[in-house]
């Protein structure tokens, strides 16, 4: 049995639960239940505060964890980074009152900065040769300048709307963050095998993100040109049709290039274009 530590609530919790469900790990969580066994897969899920996950994985309370990069870097625990998961993206940034003129990190010299991430902030200031007072608070960091508690803040930024509503502006991005999969350094052979299977499932989900499965009918005389347009995983799949002058073509394309590619296919005579979503992809 492999124990996974995940955040107990919030955006990271929601996106983690979605990933686990897509990976075939089914959970029925009650409000007060902190440890749950999954159905159909040898894992159990431990629900914790995000900032407790790195230590819990490092000391073996949990075998692996899904945690925000901000907490993983801040805590500096001896847990191994296994995989970047690509969701819950945000950034740790410095922000100052919006009307202040900013020309560089020297602005923070002698200032007081409020934060919940003192270790990361201290490292940044030392690299820049800036001496500032760090005021550690937990929660509602963004209000600190407005109530005279600090001159600036160092905090998580997603959309930036919270900064705007508190008359602040972002001036330095210190650490881009996303969800990470981390693991204890001393997992047994059995647990490593379960982790490998879990990674296989996660990667199949990630590879499929932003991809579309395309089926179309193509005139044989234009087939070579159509194949050049379609990227495919290796090469498009070509299937004969009852009409000898036409073939069926199947391929995978990136959604960000979808309309550009579809336009080219139509101009080359492709017909009956069918586009399907892809849930998972094994490569």
UniProtKB/Swiss-Prot annotation:
It is found in: Cytoplasm. Its cofactor is Mg(2+). One of its GO terms (molecular function) is ATP binding. One of its GO terms (biological process) is L-histidine biosynthetic process. Pfam families: HisG, HisG_C. It catalyses: 1-(5-phospho-beta-D-ribosyl)-ATP + diphosphate = 5-phospho-alpha-D-ribose 1-diphosphate + ATP. Keywords: Amino-acid biosynthesis, ATP-binding, Cytoplasm, Glycosyltransferase, Histidine biosynthesis, Magnesium, Metal-binding, Nucleotide-binding, Transferase. One of its GO terms (cellular component) is cytoplasm. Its main location: cytoplasm. Its EC number is 2.4.2.17. Coiled coil: none annotated. InterPro entries: ATP-PRT_HisG_long (IPR020621), ATP_PRibTrfase_cat (IPR013820), ATP_PRibTrfase_CS (IPR018198), ATP_PRibTrfase_HisG (IPR001348), HisG_C (IPR013115), N-reg_PII-like_a/b (IPR011322), N-reg_PII/ATP_PRibTrfase_C (IPR015867). Pathway: Amino-acid biosynthesis; L-histidine biosynthesis; L-histidine from 5-phospho-alpha-D-ribose 1-diphosphate: step 1/9. PROSITE patterns: ATP_P_PHORIBOSYLTR. Feedback inhibited by histidine. Catalyzes the condensation of ATP and 5-phosphoribose 1-diphosphate to form N'-(5'-phosphoribosyl)-ATP (PR-ATP). Has a crucial role in the pathway because the rate of histidine biosynthesis seems to be controlled primarily by regulation of HisG enzymatic activity. Belongs to the ATP phosphoribosyltransferase family. Long subfamily. This is ATP phosphoribosyltransferase. It comes from Parabacteroides distasonis (strain ATCC 8503 / DSM 20701 / CIP 104284 / JCM 5825 / NCTC 11152).
């Amino acid at each position: 049995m492999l124990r996974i530590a995940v955040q107990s609530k919030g955006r990271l919790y929601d996106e983690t639960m979605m990933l686990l469900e897509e990976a075939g790990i089914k959970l029925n969580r009650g409000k007060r239940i902190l440890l749950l066994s999954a159905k159909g897969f040898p894992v159990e899920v431990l629900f914790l505060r995000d900032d407790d996950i790195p230590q819990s994985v490092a000391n073996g309370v949990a075998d692996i964890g899904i945690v925000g990069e901000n907490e993983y870097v801040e805590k500096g625990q001896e847990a191994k980074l296994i995989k970047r998961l690509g969701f819950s993206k945000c950034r740790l940034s410095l922000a100052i009152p919006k009307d202040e003129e900013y020309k560089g990190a020297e602005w923070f010299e002698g200032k007081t900065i409020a934060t919940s991430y003192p270790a990361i902030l201290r490292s940044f200031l030392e690299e820049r040769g800036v001496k500032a007072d760090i005021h550690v608070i937990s929660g509602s960091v963004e209000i600190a300048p407005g109530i005279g508690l600090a001159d600036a803040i160092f905090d998580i930024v997603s959309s930036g709307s919270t900064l705007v509503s508190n008359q602040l502006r972002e001036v330095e991005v210190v650490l881009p963050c996303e969800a990470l999969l981390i693991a204890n350094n001393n997992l047994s052979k059995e647990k490593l095998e379960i982790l490998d299977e879990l990674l296989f499932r996660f990667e199949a989900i990630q590879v499929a993100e932003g991809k579309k499965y395309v089926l179309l009918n193509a005139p044989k005389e234009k087939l070579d040109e159509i194949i050049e347009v379609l990227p495919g995983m290796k090469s498009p799949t070509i299937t004969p049709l009852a009409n000898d002058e036409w073939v069926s073509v199947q391929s995978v394309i990136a959604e960000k290039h979808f309309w550009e590619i579809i336009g080219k296919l139509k101009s080359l005579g492709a017909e009956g274009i069918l586009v399907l979503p892809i849930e998972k992809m094994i490569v």
